[in-house]
A protein has these predicted regions:
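Canonical alpha-helical transmembrane segments
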Residues: 54-58, 79-94
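Loop-to-helix transition at the N-terminal end of transmembrane alpha-helices
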Residues: 64-80
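Long, highly hydrophobic alpha-helical transmembrane signal-anchor segments
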Residues: 47-69
């Protein structure tokens, strides 16, 4: 019985070692990053199209601050659809001959972009709350409703983007150890470059 347990343990160790090696290959990492970027861009596009559709339908029937809420959703998501469309066009084809350096650079550049976007998202949400607060002090009802509707929309859209960008940041950040293992396979010395397999 002890031999069976030891054998199972040995097999599991070998399998996990093979998996650890296979998930640190450059093609695997490139493919995984490509899929993550494509999926997140498709999610943004889906969110935007859904908002455009729902707010487009609701705008004709809305009044008061609801009218302005749907109007701002339309403005906001026209931009989001454009961003998602450009992103999807850029992701039509995976880079067939990446270098370790280019993959690492792209990985960390994307993380920095997501953190910058997170800062912008916080600014959007804050601006939305400012508009909501401003709506309470407006003298005319039309301006009050406009600020309220626009503020609600900016809070909703900024809140979505905040969750979206932070989630993407943490997903991409979780790939950093895999990249580090890949980099650990390469070492430089005065005599040349050594690659471990």
């Amino acid at each position: 019985m002890k031999n069976v347990i030891a054998s199972i343990g040995l097999i599991m160790a070998i399998v996990s070692s093979i998996q650890a090696q296979s998930d640190t290959t450059l093609p695997y990492i490139v493919q995984k990053q490509f899929k993550l970027q494509r999926t997140s861009t498709q999610i943004l596009a889906g969110w935007s199209v859904a908002n455009l559709t729902l707010s487009g339908i609701a705008l004709g029937q809305a009044n008061g601050s609801n009218k302005y809420f749907h109007e701002m959703n339309l403005y906001w998501n026209v931009i989001n659809v454009g961003i998602a469309g450009i992103g999807l066009l850029g992701l039509r084809k995976i880079n067939e001959s990446p270098t370790v350096s280019s993959v690492v650079k792209e990985h960390y550049t994307l993380q920095k972009s997501l953190l910058l976007n997170t800062g912008l998202d916080i600014a959007y949400v804050t601006s939305g709350f400012w508009l909501l607060d401003k709506s309470k002090t407006e003298i005319t009802q039309v301006r009050s409703e406009r600020f309220r509707g626009f503020g609600q929309a900016v809070v909703v859209q900024g809140g979505f983007l905040l969750v979206f960008d932070l989630t993407n940041y943490f997903i991409h950040r979780s790939d950093s150890p895999r990249l580090h293992r890949l980099l650990d396979q390469v070492s430089l010395s005065g005599n040349g470059v050594r690659v471990k397999f």
